[in-house]
From Swiss-Prot:
EC number: 3.1.11.6
Family that this chain belongs to: Belongs to the XseB family.
Subcellular location: Cytoplasm
Organism: Phenylobacterium zucineum (strain HLK1)
Record protein name field: Exodeoxyribonuclease 7 small subunit
Any one GO cellular component localisation term in the record: cytosol
């Protein structure tokens, strides 16, 4: 299932901000059922987008290490 084009174009920060707004509205319990379902679906798409962006960022992060002969070098960072 692909995400809507407007979500695909969002930065991590934009998607997270909208996701936080949706969560707050859902937690308030004030939205009608159909609106809540639509917000939940959009929230799920935003969450997936944020996870994808975070994974891409994680793969780009490198750590600086001392290579052979004391020269600085970089290698992929390991998380977990």
């Amino acid at each position: 299932m692909s995400e809507p084009a407007d979500i695909a174009a969002m930065t991590f920060e934009q998607a997270l901000a909208e996701l936080e707004q949706i969560v707050a509205r859902l937690e308030s319990g004030q939205a009608p059922l159909e609106d809540s379902i639509r917000m939940y679906e959009r929230g799920a798409a935003l969450k997936a987008h944020c996870e994808t962006r975070l994974e891409a960022a994680r793969l780009r992060v490198e750590k600086i290490v001392m290579g052979a002969g004391g020269a600085p070098a970089s290698e992929p960072a390991e998380f977990g």
